[in-house]
Amino acid sequence: MGLLDGKVGLVVGVANDRSYAWHIAKEIIANGGQCAYAHIPGEKNARRTMRAAEKLSPNPILYECDAGSDEDIEVLFSDYAKDHERLDFLIHSIAYADRDWLQIGKFAETPRKAFLEAMDISAYTLVAMSHRARPLMAKNGGGSIMAMSY
């Protein structure tokens, strides 16, 4: 019997089989849990996430979500709720920064707008997703939210 037998949740941030989110999902599944996955919009991202998720379990369920869009986050959790009876955990493992400002010698020149966009995607989305996850978790007496820090 696994520690997570019967637990079902959403993992956000599986980009490939080297991402932290993928390794977390691997351990969840190894301990009896089930994972659904959210990925960045676009067919290329869907294929990449599907390839990684299929290494963990057959027929993974994927959802598309632009984490910078409150509407997309709402749709993500609405669609998840239609497909699953429960949400026991949310794994938030996403980050974003405009690569132009990650170049050597550019960091100190990062404009406020680019910095705030990085904070919105990398940090605020945890709050937005937690807000949408909470009512789904409450239906079964609560749940767990885990986020990667950067």
Task: State what each model feature region is.
Residues 64-65, 85-103, 122, 147:
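Rossmann-fold scaffold of SDR-type NAD(P)-dependent oxidoreductases
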Residues 88, 106-128, 142, 146:
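Catalytic Tyr-X3-Lys loop
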Residues 12-14, 38, 93, 142-150:
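SDR active-site strand-loop-helix element
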Residues 68-83:
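Conserved Rossmann-fold cofactor-binding substructure of NAD(P)-dependent oxidoreductases
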Residues 53-71:
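Rossmann-fold cofactor-recognition segment
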Residues 78, 82, 95-96, 117-141:
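Amphipathic alpha-helical dimer-interface segment in Rossmann-like NAD(P)H-dependent oxidoreductases
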Residues 2-38:
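Canonical Rossmann dinucleotide-binding motif of NAD(H)/NADP(H)-dependent dehydrogenases/reductases
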Residues 41-43:
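Residues in the short beta-alpha loop(s) of Rossmann-like NAD(P)-binding domains
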